[in-house]
């Protein structure tokens, strides 16, 4: 076999100088809602695309949305990027923020009681 060095050298130069592909950061986030009174729990994965998402639309087909009402006592990030920031609002009022440093949120604001909150009008806004 005869190798043509003139043909191989350019290919080697391209292969050596090629920069590795960057690992793309996923914009997917998984948020779970739990209801400590009923024992229901559901996690939903969606795009953290800097838009408002309806909590009712995300969770209505899950155990926390049984009976047509999404009720939960807590929210938790279960799969996320290090730069995630999710704000939960209900009826226009901010309930709280979930981040990589604060992955759990008591929705009723009471550490002494588990009071399910109706989240049918809630929105979650996540960005990376």
Where is each model-derived feature located?
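Fungal secretory targeting signals
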Residues: 1-25, 128
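Mature, structured extracellular domains of secreted fungal proteins
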Residues: 19-128
């Amino acid at each position: 076999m005869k190798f043509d060095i003139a043909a191989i050298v350019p290919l080697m130069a391209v292969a050596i100088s090629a920069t590795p592909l960057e690992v793309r950061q996923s914009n997917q986030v998984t948020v779970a809602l739990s209801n400590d009174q009923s024992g229901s729990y559901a996690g939903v994965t969606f795009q953290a695309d800097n838009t408002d998402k309806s909590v009712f639309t995300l969770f209505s087909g899950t155990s926390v949305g049984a009976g047509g009402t999404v009720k939960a006592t807590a929210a938790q990030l279960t799969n996320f990027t290090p730069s995630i920031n999710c704000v939960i609002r209900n009826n226009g009022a901010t309930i709280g923020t979930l981040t990589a440093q604060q992955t759990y949120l008591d929705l009723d604001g009471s550490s002494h009681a588990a009071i399910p909150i109706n989240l049918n009008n809630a929105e979650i806004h996540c960005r990376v």
